[in-house]
UniProtKB/Swiss-Prot annotation:
InterPro entries: Acyl_CoA_acyltransferase, Diverse_Substrate_AcTransf, GNAT_dom. Homodimer. Its main location: cytoplasm. Enzyme which catalyzes the acetylation of polyamines. Substrate specificity: norspermidine = spermidine >> spermine > N(1)-acetylspermine. This highly regulated enzyme allows a fine attenuation of the intracellular concentration of polyamines. Also involved in the regulation of polyamine transport out of cells. Also acts on 1,3-diaminopropane and 1,5-diaminopentane. SUPFAM superfamilies: Acyl-CoA N-acyltransferases (Nat). It is found in: Cytoplasm, Cytosol. It catalyses: an alkane-alpha,omega-diamine + acetyl-CoA = an N-acetylalkane-alpha,omega-diamine + CoA + H(+); spermidine + acetyl-CoA = N(1)-acetylspermidine + CoA + H(+); spermine + acetyl-CoA = N(1)-acetylspermine + CoA + H(+). Keywords: Acyltransferase, Cytoplasm, Transferase. PROSITE patterns: GNAT. This is Diamine acetyltransferase 1.
Amino acid sequence: MAKFKIRPATASDCSDILRLIKELAKYEYMEDQVMLTEKDLLEDGFGEHPFYHCLIAEVPKEHWTPEGHSIVGFAMYYFTYDPWIGKLLYLEDFFVMSDYRGFGIGSEILKNLSQVAMKCRCSSMHFLVAEWNEPSINFYKRRGASDLSSEEGWRLFKIDKEYLLKMAAEE
């Protein structure tokens, strides 16, 4: 399959973006953790101050999925800032449906993301990969990615909403 198009997502793509988010979560054995709704995606990504940006991979009608979907991959990203090196593109989610892997779609999405990062004068692109996900780790390493957890010893933490509320209410 040589024909596919990578383009910025539009508000009308939110249902497909959510479908792919759920497919990615299932692939990562975390499907029960997706709480986001299509409405959330619409408000958070396509309002006056979007919290995220998204590229999608779209195939022509002759290559649609058996369920009739033309959108077969996506990359959700946002910009952040590192006080040591400046602007960063943070790749939050990146997924190509399994039947559409091996056709260069993922490589083209990553190329487009790299172009966005360079256009915005970002110093680097950061992202997380599950430790067990060797295919993705190898995909990124072949393109020059370095594993900061093993090379620099960084650990990722999170503070859930209940604890944010608790800290915010402290006097």
